[in-house]
């Protein structure tokens, strides 16, 4: 009986892997490797095969106590069902956006949602400033408030061509098309060579 159940579970798992491969830029072999990586990541604090916000923040900044705006925003975008945990399917689908073959538009939309911390459908100056400060603090870097304000002002001067004090998705897409380096961190090169980078997860 146990053997039959085990085979059924393995068959279902293989179906899930095949489905994820068909929906993303990853091959079945690469999804297998990502599954091994996911299991390793989810076991950092407990073995429940889910990435909770606490685990996610621990992986990103090695600290579960300190609030991290960027970690919260990234977690929220991975957590597509908004149920407080990232499952393997959500993990793969979100990583797919960072794949080198993913479209610039998908990357731009993801980055836009990252900066739209209040989820209003547009980016406000205060949101950009908060994200800059958060990233600087996590990197243990310091910039004066006047320099940060100057960066924010310059960004809006370039991006907000409608001059209404906010950046909507259309303006954002125009901005990143003009300054493609803005999306540099939206591509993870090794996702195109997963089996070589993570050979220990091959089965």
Curated annotation (Swiss-Prot):
Both N-myristoylation and calcium-mediated conformational changes are essential for its function. A lipid is attached at residue 2 (N-myristoyl glycine). SMART domains: EFh. It holds the Pfam family EF-hand_7. Keywords: Cytoplasm, Lipoprotein, Myristate, Nucleus, Repeat. GO terms for biological process: calcium-mediated signaling; response to osmotic stress; response to salt stress; response to water deprivation. Residues 30-65, 66-101, 103-138, 147-182 form the EF-hand domain. InterPro entries: CNBL1-10 (IPR045198), EF-hand-dom_pair (IPR011992), EF_hand_dom (IPR002048). It is found in: Cytoplasm; Nucleus. The record marks 139 as: Involved in dimerization. One of its GO terms (cellular component) is cytoplasm. Belongs to the calcineurin regulatory subunit family. The N-terminal 12 amino acids are sufficient for cell membrane targeting of a heterologous protein. Homodimer. Interacts with PP2CA, CIPK2, CIPK11, CIPK23 and CIPK24. This is Calcineurin B-like protein 5. The gene is CBL5.
């Amino acid at each position: 009986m146990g053997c039959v159940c085990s085979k059924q579970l393995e068959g279902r798992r293989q179906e899930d892997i095949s489905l994820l491969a068909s929906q993303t830029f990853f091959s079945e072999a690469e999804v297998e490797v990502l599954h091994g990586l996911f299991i390793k990541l989810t076991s950092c604090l407990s073995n429940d095969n889910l990435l909770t916000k606490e685990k996610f923040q621990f992986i990103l900044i090695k600290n579960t106590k300190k609030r991290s705006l960027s970690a919260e925003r990234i977690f929220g975008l991975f957590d597509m069902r908004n149920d407080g945990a990232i499952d393997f399917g959500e993990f793969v689908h979100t990583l797919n956006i960072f794949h080198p073959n993913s479209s610039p538009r998908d990357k731009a939309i993801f980055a836009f949602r990252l900066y739209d911390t209040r989820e209003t459908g547009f980016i406000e100056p205060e949101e950009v400033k908060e994200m800059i400060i958060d990233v600087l603090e996590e990197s243990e870097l310091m910039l004066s408030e006047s320099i940060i304000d100057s960066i924010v002002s310059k960004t809006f001067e370039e991006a907000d061509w409608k001059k209404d004090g906010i950046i909507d998705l259309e303006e954002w897409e125009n901005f990143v098309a003009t300054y493609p380096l803005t999306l540099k961190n939206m591509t993870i090169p090794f996702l195109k060579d997963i089996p070589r980078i993570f050979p220990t997860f091959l089965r």
